[in-house]
């Protein structure tokens, strides 16, 4: 910030000026201080004006964990929701969605269960083996987020993990006590989860941010932020992807939006959007990707026989 002096006839007018960058353009906030001010009077009015300018700046941007978004950037992200159709599923469509979601979310993580096997597994009285347990578990978790009145919390996050993996993983429902990393097929580290010592605080910060800022963002953008930040934290030893995609849908359902499905065939693009968020704090690719997935979900679920 700096003081700008302007001559106006025989008078000198003073302004406090602050420059900032938004979307590659330099913008200015200019606050009038007065005219013909003495040294002490200028200092006093400058200090008051500085607080006012800082307040304006605070309103213009929102902290989003490791980065900030300006009001203009938030508005642009929120407009992506105009590209999706808001509708409500009937019981048959919910069944179709659940089967599609269960298959894809597990397959993304390496499950060998085929799409056509899912209905039979869900109707079996008892699951056989870890993959069938997780098939039934994820379906139960979908039903849970559909019905629950609970809002986002650490306990809810742990509950979803327990529902998905009870019987298949010894640590179901428990936050990890070991360090974790996401590696690619070559064994190269793509992302390291938050350290164990910071894990609980990171989750608390995520939930506090959600409660404080959820009115600023449209549901799809809000869901994208929480999903990406959850994956950044990586609070479980395993199963973070599936719980993250459930949380994404929990937030959508809380806002009376239909759920969406991220498909196996789009896994590579999905991972790229996460990398953009984690490495470059760029949320736009995720929101654009989710819009496309939303359209595919609606078509798949509402078309007769679930065929596109």
Predicted feature descriptions by range:
Residues 1-238, 242-308:
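FIC/Doc superfamily catalytic core
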């Amino acid at each position: 910030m700096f003081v700008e002096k302007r001559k106006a006839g025989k008078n000198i007018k003073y302004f406090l000026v602050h420059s900032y960058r938004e979307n590659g353009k330099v913008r200015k906030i200019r606050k009038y201080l007065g005219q013909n001010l003495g040294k002490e009077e200028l200092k006093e009015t400058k200090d008051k004006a500085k607080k006012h300018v800082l307040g304006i700046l605070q309103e213009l941007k929102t902290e989003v964990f490791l980065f900030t978004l300006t009001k203009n950037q938030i508005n642009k992200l929120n407009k992506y929701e105009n590209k999706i159709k808001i509708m409500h599923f009937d019981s048959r469509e919910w069944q179709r969605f659940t089967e599609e979601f269960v298959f894809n979310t597990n397959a993304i993580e390496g499950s060998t269960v085929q799409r056509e096997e899912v209905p039979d597994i869900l109707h079996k009285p008892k699951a056989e083996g870890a993959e069938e347990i997780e098939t039934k578990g994820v379906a139960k978790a979908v039903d849970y987020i559909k019905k629950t009145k609970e809002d986002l919390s650490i306990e809810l996050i742990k509950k979803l993990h327990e529902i998905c993996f009870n019987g298949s993983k010894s640590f179901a429902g428990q936050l990890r006590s070991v360090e974790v990393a996401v590696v690619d097929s070559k064994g190269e580290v793509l992302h390291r989860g938050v350290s164990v010592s910071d894990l609980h605080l990171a989750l608390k910060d995520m939930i506090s941010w959600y409660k404080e800022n959820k009115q600023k963002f449209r549901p799809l953008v809000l869901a994208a932020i929480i999903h990406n930040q959850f994956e950044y934290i990586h609070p479980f030893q395993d199963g973070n992807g599936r719980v993250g995609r459930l949380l994404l849908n929990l937030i959508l359902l809380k806002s009376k939006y239909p759920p969406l499905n991220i498909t196996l065939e789009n896994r590579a693009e999905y991972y790229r959007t996460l990398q953009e968020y984690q490495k470059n704090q760029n949320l736009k690719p995720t929101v654009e990707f989710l819009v496309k997935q939303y359209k595919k979900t609606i078509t798949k679920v509402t078309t007769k026989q679930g065929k596109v």
